């Protein structure tokens, strides 16, 4: 019998809202948006945690510019370090720049281990940055965190929308409440609005394609000044806070 | 390595959940398999368990620890080896990383024969509750879970 | 005993060069480049197969515009349909637009099944489009196809390079010969060239960011006219054909 | 469903590989577990095996088929059910997809209790070689592989 499973709800008990940032598709901006959202919620005086769950390719630390010497503190478990007011947990603390050849089963086992020993304390929001796909990590987060909400990210590309459509169908089957869809890297007219309507999911708004984003990566002050960050604030106000999702 | 406290909490919580489910009034003993890979500090775990059990159904429980050697099998060349064969090559921070997250073995350990990090942990990964004994309405109950 | 494993080398015996298109990172263009490369090799009179191995989110069929009624033929196994001179295999034939909640273990089991029953026949090239991550699919393709080459795709973003660096380290450990790195969506100066040098991997060239690509998706004639397709031809001539990789 | 031919080829190839490895001169019998989920057409498989064995070490081999019921367990609600409970709900093309790739069960089958497609195939997935009997240097060899 695995003793870790029954402690997980306990560890997350004082967190009001758990949000998994998902897409099915890679490279649509899940990590950038998760990280920015955590920073911006913290600036709105919310207590926020950010958990990078892409154990093959963690990268929230690159967006935030978390220095390498920062580490969790061991105290009756692991206490995630606070960086720019965000409690941040990542496998990168331990693996540094090394290869992470974890199979799906190993990745979720590692996630379960960290969920069972991490002491988040009281939080208003825990943002979970998921890897692409609808595989082990997504399925197990849904299984382990019964009150998790899904926030869906997509680009306007045909190559993203078919995969996102598969994901939305899956979330509906699994009865995960969906906060809505954020369209990222928008340029010109939106097809995503109609897509969201067709899929019967709330369209939360668009973030523009912004070519100043790249040089802002790793510098929180610059990041918060980008067009992407500014557009995200409105979505957070209207689409994340006080939105309890459509249980599908 | 004081995160053993968190592991102790998860053991106590799990045993209490099972006891409730099986209507156990008092837990007599709990058998815990301790996988070698996680390098648990057994004394700290024991102290934590003994502190956490107070005032619960586990008050009178004895904890029995069964240590399990860690063993790996390479998916590339099928070679089988033991954690004790390679442990000495780990740096302190690498061993500590594996202590927190045993799957990090795939980051810091390689097959001694072919060098692959793609292996199966055959046994000895971490903590498992292997048996609980307790009393339900006066009669002892044995459970191999 | 699993009877599928020993037949796989047999099924692939008459294929000269197997190339896995990988990145670790999602959304860098693996699928677009795999598909275009297959089309262009076929136009160079090579016999080409394309196998979409992203079983959670297959999408080569969207790039190519493969109509839904096209299906493999059953004949002592499965014979992949030929589309625009490319023999094309995908789980999409069977799953259509439905969700694909396959865990890593299930995905590789499905891949093994298809590898063991698909009759590619004689080919000069088999292009394998991998999902992001360094998880089950990547590890098992390396394990099952002993003579596979890796072709690495990245964008210039910091967010791609760290993950790609982890991947390259892994490929070197596993002794997979690396054909080189293609830089995709390049704009302005390249940091990827220096990155490749530092990692001691061949830099094969760059494909420009091209905003006409999106409307060309699904239409092979339009696709072959894009700047991306034209830049890829040179890379194929100098970097894919007659390149036997650096075994690392 | 003539892809059974390809499956037969993989069985014969595997048995020949094992026979070679274990220095078996003539294979007497091969026991094959047939998982129900894959809906193998047994007659076609048999014909293919009998054709493929000619002129090989399997020339005299008898094929013994053991059918294995397919069973699932839901990861969400732990419910266990049988393929035969849900088979009738599959359309022809869905059943054929599963016939080619048993993992497509996760696309076309859901837990009858909670509706989740996230389940374990406990048994009866596909084809396995469960035993090979043969003669090495005149003496019979039994192998439970
Ligand atoms: N709105 C945007 N404008 C420009 N580039 C973006 C934008 N959002 C994300 N990116 C870039 O796109 C790439 C993928 O983003 P990332 O957050 O890593 O996606 P995911 O986590 O979905 O894989 C990164 O290089 C990132 O810097
Ligand atoms: N050179 C390019 N210029 C513009 N867009 C591109 C280019 N290459 C790929 N894309 C777009 O980027 C997105 C990701 O490409 P895709 O091939 O699906 O990546 P991956 O397979 O690595 O996830 C798609 O929307 C695709 O159309
Ligand atoms: Mg990401
Ligand atoms: Mg994965
Ligand atoms: Mg792809
Ligand atoms: Mg996967
Ligand atoms: Ni510890
Ligand atoms: Ni068939
Ligand atoms: Zn090995
Ligand atoms: Zn269920």
Regions found by a protein language model. Give the residues of each.
Chain B
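N-terminal, polar/charged subdomain of small-to-medium soluble alpha/beta proteins
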Residues: 1-29, 36-145
